[in-house]
């Protein structure tokens, strides 16, 4: 996958936006447990009162609190409260830091006031110890005591407070503030409801932001992944179009189709999910860990155990399943190959009654793929139940440990709830990565297969400084001591072939099956590079010309007629779209194609199906010839292109073609002697060697191989 990352450069801006949205989504996701905790701790348990800093309190209460404050604390309180009648109001513009200081000042003082009130056991004990008359407030007595005595009492209390959980101190301060509000006539229930309502509204706002961020990330991810798929398909197409025949043989057609469709689709799907899940999971997981550490670090060991178990499960499963992921795409290739062979060979299969054999071949390929898929899926089915077991076990363990912490006063119920939610978010982040890990290995294999195509070195490339043929020389072909062997083949297919064809000449190539006829003419358009010697067109070595300039000079008709989906007109115009309708008709007339075109209702606009399956072999061949004629090239190459024609059509076509191509060079590969009798030069190939060259008459006189071919096809009267 990493090798294909360069194709994401165009979408760098979108990727940055996705990451920003994911951080926003994670922030909101991680904020929700905190709000839940606050609703339970503050909204329910503390009646909506957040801390020990009262917004309003009576003068008498403040005086009692100041008994247990030092001079600095008293000064800070007086600076942040304003006197109004017999009450004190908290200033509106205090900072967060100041409020925290006031909370610390008030919490301890409120505990002391509550402890020494005349209703408390400690207050009654102190009154008895000091011999105070019944009904005397101990706080009044404390106010009259020397400051040293009060500070001594405070020191003793501080020692006790050190061992007391912070939550108990907070609860005591909040209870004091609630009592003070009730004494002032404030509606504490309204305060509680307002806090819960506002917290709920904030949570709804967070949920809305999460939804919008998730939708935006999904939309942008799909766009980026779609562009990646588009660019990969384009790159594969351009690369494949630059392949020589050598590279085509390296990859089968079925494999190239799979790589440019199925493999690209795999990468595209995983990339879309990767932005939404793989990037989001670590953001959420790390954020959850940080939140957990802030909530209560005493239970983080539970998360450590959970994460360790998850990693062990993933490691074991992937050690078992990973080898199968690697061969999965190869098996898909195999199934595509078998399917393609069967579908294209149905007539032959039926003719030889081999349906059962082909059914067995398909069944084997299908069964191999099915077994591998089942094995992988069975491995992965264990993953989710095990993960859910770990998740539920962690929840139970957190509740058990949290209950003890709540009972000991070291943790609040809301914090336990928040811890559970954070733990679930951390585990869910691992679950998301685990879910992706099912697709990632397969997508990685697909990416490697795509990269294999894109990284393939093309054996036939344009020269850095191309040579342009002279305008004075056109249509000239020269083979200069050419030898050729297929890549990785031990023997030459062609050996020491030399001949020269000039403008206006017709060169024929004949020989037995496998003698190298098609290979010879495939060297002219440079489908292969020669092993030795050189092939020249218009006096320039084809290796020194650009492939486009070379092939623009050629009109090539392959041995097997190839048509493209469209119309008859579009197929004839294929090599030169700008030609006129009259030129299209002329090309069809020369190719003897008007005979069947004119019988069709739509004539030249008649549809041609993919591969030309709705026309006969002879019609397909004639349209292929018309396509080459319409291009009006300098050189015509016919690779046994008349074999599908009847003798009458063959004769008429050759007669019309001779007149039309009189100013062009024509190279014909033929099996029938009658097709090439009038050629200016006939090259006779025998097992890759040139057995003879000359006219029909000359070869009949001095070439034994040609004589054998001629006598096997024609009678002595026809040869005379």
Task: Go through each PLM region and give its residues.
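Short intracellular "coupling" helices and adjacent cytoplasmic loop segments at the cytosolic face
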Residues: 44-51, 58-65, 70, 138-146, ...
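Alpha-helical transmembrane segments
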Residues: 25, 29-33, 205, 210-225, ...
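Membrane-integrated ABC transporters
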Residues: 1-32, 36-203, 209, 213, ...
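An intracellular "coupling" helix at the cytosolic face of ABC transporter transmembrane type-1 domains
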Residues: 146, 153, 245-246, 262-271, ...
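Residue-level recognition of pore/gate-forming positions within transmembrane alpha-helices
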Residues: 22, 207, 277, 281, ...
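Extended hydrophobic secondary-structure segments
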Residues: 217, 242, 249-278, 300, ...
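ABC-type nucleotide-binding domain
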Residues: 15, 51, 66, 71-72, ...
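Helix-loop-helix
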Residues: 287, 291-308, 312-314, 318-319, ...
